[in-house]
Curated annotation (Swiss-Prot):
Organism: Debaryomyces hansenii (strain ATCC 36239 / CBS 767 / BCRC 21394 / JCM 1990 / NBRC 0083 / IGC 2968)
Catalytic residues identified in the record: 44, 83, 109
Protein name: Signal peptidase complex catalytic subunit SEC11
Subunit structure: Component of the signal peptidase complex (SPC) composed of a catalytic subunit SEC11 and three accessory subunits SPC1, SPC2 and SPC3. The complex induces a local thinning of the ER membrane which is used to measure the length of the signal peptide (SP) h-region of protein substrates. This ensures the selectivity of the complex towards h-regions shorter than 18-20 amino acids. SPC associates with the translocon complex.
Localization terms from the record: Endoplasmic reticulum membrane
Length: 167
C-alpha cells in the first residue's frame, strides 16, 4: 500500500467519525439533552421496557407529569436511570421536584438519590422524558459492555476488515 492510499483511508475514517459526532451533537441540541438516546441496562422497568431497548429522549418539556417515564442521572454516578415519575411537587419558586420508581421495583428511588436528596430536580437531574423506543436494538451495547470475549472479537473483526479493504 502506498502512503496516498493510506491517507485516503484515514481521511474517510475521519469523515465517518466526524459525521457521526455532528449528527449526535445536532440531535442533542434538538432534544435539549446531552444524551438523547439511551439503552435500558436493567429489568427495573419491565414489562414497559426490556433490557436492550433503545429509548429516545426529549427534554424540551417544562414539566414532567406523574406517569411519565424519565431518564435521570445522580450526581457522582455515570449511569443514567430509567424510571417512572411517581410523585411531583413544586416549591415556592415553581421549581418542579420528582420522586421516581421502577415499574418492576418494590420501593421508590429515594435510596438511589444522593445523600440528603429527597426528590429529583426537574431542571438539573433529568436527562429527558422518553418519547419513543426500539425494542432490543441496543442489546449489542450490553454485549460489548458485559462480555469481554465478544468485545475483543468484534474489535478484531473490525481491524481485519479495515486492513483487508481495498477502498
Amino acid at each position: 500500500m502506498n502512503i496516498r492510499h493510506q491517507l485516503v483511508q484515514f481521511l474517510n475514517l475521519a469523515l465517518v467519525l466526524s459525521s457521526a459526532f455532528m449528527a449526535w451533537k445536532t440531535l442533542s441540541v434538538i432534544t435539549n439533552s446531552h444524551s438523547p438516546i439511551v439503552v435500558v441496562l436493567s429489568g427495573s422497568m419491565e414489562p414497559a421496557f426490556q433490557r436492550g431497548d433503545i429509548l429516545f429522549l426529549w427534554n424540551r418539556d417544562n414539566h414532567a407529569k406523574v406517569g411519565d417515564v424519565v431518564v435521570y442521572e445522580i450526581k457522582g454516578k455515570s449511569i443514567p436511570i430509567v424510571h417512572r415519575v411517581l410523585r411531583e411537587h413544586h416549591n415556592a419558586e415553581s421549581k418542579q421536584f420528582l420522586l421516581t420508581k421502577g415499574d418492576n421495583n418494590a420501593v421508590d428511588d429515594l435510596g438511589l438519590y444522593a445523600k440528603k436528596q429527597a426528590y429529583l430536580n426537574q431542571k438539573t437531574d433529568l436527562v429527558g422524558t422518553v418519547k419513543g423506543y426500539l425494542p432490543m436494538v441496543g442489546y449489542i451495547t450490553i454485549l460489548i459492555t458485559e462480555n469481554i470475549y465478544f468485545r475483543y472479537t468484534l474489535l478484531g473483526l473490525m481491524g481485519i476488515s479495515s486492513l483487508l479493504s481495498n477502498e
